[in-house]
């Protein structure tokens, strides 16, 4: 016989399959020894041991005194009024139980390594009814402690269990469906550091403590099929406070509470679970309902689950939980030192009808996070009590400002019927956040961002949204004031993105119109909303298939840091604007219109800053009755145009003097242009700028103001730099160099006037000022620099050097058949200008000259007709 099978040195009740009974009474078992069960080994039958003593029995492996064990049968043993002293074994110093054991009114002293080892599948009834009984039983049992009745804390023992039953050993407690009730007298369990505890199939109620109303865990705790309800903590962890490792599975947390509602400096919470700094939390298949009682928005509380340590939550259900920062879950990595962050992972879970001011579903404050395959439905963030409604954000998820460098992913999730002031479903203030494969439907915000609101006064969140669907969110799907990426590659993508987003739309790739979508975008992407589009340096190409943008009346649009190319339309090849449009750091090149506005046609308000217009064109070259043009910009009758710091180059391609075209910028409405650069633009009436107040009714005129700008090497028959036709104008601090008005093609050279500026006949009563400007090396037939045919024109503090005219007025020609110009010149210089007549000036009308210097003009300075 091998020693491994040596059992029961005193008594063995072996396996036979018979239904037997046995009684051991008034007996003493001392100094017995075996490999298994030092004194008694019971493998079958209903056996009663009563009024017996077991002293100094031992087993090498298990059951120093008694083993209740069988590989075949299911023995049931009851031990009554017996004593176990100084028995020993590796497992179960006194008793090892594998099946059914009841112990009544018995005492255990000095047994080792433990008193009772109860196997996981076994049932052990120790008659536990009070917290004292429970504490004693935990002291006795190793393995699994089973409960066979409900347990309640009594008033008499409350003082001893303020911190709960202490568990400082590895143990599994099987509640067998019973309830442990602390009666609001104290905590239920405190689990020590370094110990592994499992609690299963039990209900814990009415626990109350400063932290962790039901459980305070410093060890490694697993809760399986446990219900925790109506527990409360003064500050943190209404049901559970975790400072160790906590695993929760298939459990319920209901109506747990936080007593103190916080202050300006302290935020309490975690009514279900508070996972502390070093805590690690895992939750699966569990329900969290109605946690935080009687919440008011003035209460400074965080979510049903609050976590500073790492947390993983899966396949769980959160309903009707409340808190100021996170009704269901709050994660607070911002409390960690330096750049450290914690991680929250949530998957396969449902958040429904939770409430809170910020993130009624999930509140993220300085944490990396992943939310996948979740449902957020009917969560709400609304102000009441002493909280104004203006601050209620993100009914489903809030990612708030903390200054931490965090990342977040939201994927495969549904957001429906959520409601807040800002960000009906999601509000994002920081981090690099990716949202993909998700549905946003019927979410609403009272102010902005029906589905998503992206904004911060402190940080610069970057948000990417891909492969997601937005349906019936109000007032719009997305409001963005920071950086948003939507994976836009086609015009259809761009139109959809604009329809989704309010605030700022960010482009993260080049965009091109495809042949398949061209028929739908002949007039371009329609913008009928206020929006900012940040191109991030990317290019939008219409591929000569249609216009790029059409902007509706009454809407304010900003386009920045983008390139628009190959747009084509009847008017406004790249942009047709009826609204209020700002172009900043935008390049428009190789766009074309059939008639007006090769790049932009403006019928609203247009502001252009630090932008480039290059090689834009007009396809039709006009007729005797129609003058087309504005290859860069055509500013229509009611248009208001402001341009600053921008370059206009090479607009109008392959110009011929027979082409009836007006300048790169053509304006009928008012226009202000400053600090800009015009080079190598061409047109018949105004190569660079044409202003046409003559087209306005009656005596009305428009106004052109040009300052601090350079006009170089522009070409045209009349006013290669600026052509003025019935407009008030001011030109100040500008440079006009090497502009030419010369005839070619079928145009005779006799009519080529004013290479820099032409003020032509219209019979309008106009006024013009030219001041502080330089005119050098300009050349024309008449008026090498300026030709003036009408208006009250004042020229002051300007220089005219090396300008020339083939016929007359090397610098200025004042001459007309129909008009009556009145010109005054003061404080100016005319040097080295030349013409056949009037090397500097020819005057046929009314000229006044004061304090002006003439040097080396040929053949003379002024030729004045009588």
Question: Language-model segments: which ranges?
Answer:
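Surface-exposed loop/turn motifs in large extracellular/passenger domains
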Residues: 1-3, 10-26, 33, 41-51, ...
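Structural detector of coil-to-beta-strand junctions
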Residues: 8-10, 37-39, 63-67, 92-94, ...
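N-terminal capping/linker segments that flank leucine-rich repeat
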Residues: 127-144, 486-507
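Arginine-selective low-complexity/disordered segments
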Residues: 43, 187, 261, 300, ...
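N-terminal extracellular ligand-recognition/capping segment immediately after the signal peptide
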Residues: 145-170, 178-180, 184, 505-530, ...
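Intrinsically disordered, low-complexity repeat/linker tracts enriched for polar/charged residues
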Residues: 35, 90, 99, 114-117, ...
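Surface-exposed loop/turn segments connecting beta-strands in extracellular beta-rich domains
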Residues: 1-6, 31-34, 56-58, 62, ...
